[in-house]
Amino acid sequence: EIALNDRSIGIEIVNDFKCQNVGNLNANPDSIELECSFPSYPKNQIDLVLSLIKEILKRHPEIDPIDIVAHSDIAPNRKSDPGPNFPWEEFYNHGIGAWYDISDFNEQLNKLKKQLPSVLEVQCALSIYGYPVELTGVQDRQSQFAVRAFQLHFRPSNYTGLIDEETTAILYALNKKYRSELVDDKTSCKNNND
């Protein structure tokens, strides 16, 4: 039971969206330029999903907050659902899933105003949090898809897939809260990526 589908509970949320690539892959094959249309979720649908997940967590209290993820978090190069309109912060406020502390975010943001980390350091932080990203040191296509998936989940107001201060501050705040033991382990990026 090492495959994700063998050890997970999936909830398929129907909310049709459409994405199309508007970039020129011949001009810049390492860039993703997707234009997407994501409809809003009806309140009754969100209430039903909240209720369902609460029941699942009662039966499986061993599920960690960081293990409640989106399809796009697991397969960022292939999936975009549930999209930027899914209310992750609201779910966190109901005791479901992970979210960053605003004080940690502000602390990280102040540090990053002096200097943004390298692409490799951000890739490492994404890997520590659990995103499938190869450590290349280049803001390549696979990195942009991973960053975009992260942004769809934690910073849905702007999900370009490009590394910026706000995205990095959120990522670092989440790792501080949920993965501090791995952040302090200097071999965690290598081990997490093997």
Residue ranges of model-derived segments:
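A charge-rich, low-complexity, intrinsically flexible signal that marks solvent-exposed coils, linkers
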Residues: 1, 81-82, 86
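Active-site-adjacent loop/helix surface patches within enzyme catalytic domains
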Residues: 1-62, 66
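Short catalytic/ligand-binding loop motif for oxyanion handling, primarily in non-cytosolic enzymes
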Residues: 20, 75-78
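Second-shell loop/turn segments in exported
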Residues: 31-44, 77-78, 108-115, 132-137, ...
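Surface-exposed patches in mature extracellular/periplasmic domains of secreted proteins
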Residues: 56-70, 135-138, 159-162
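Acidic, His- and aromatic-enriched active-site or binding-groove loops in soluble protein domains
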Residues: 84-108
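Short acidic, glycine/serine/threonine-rich helix-capping segments at coil-helix boundaries
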Residues: 112-185
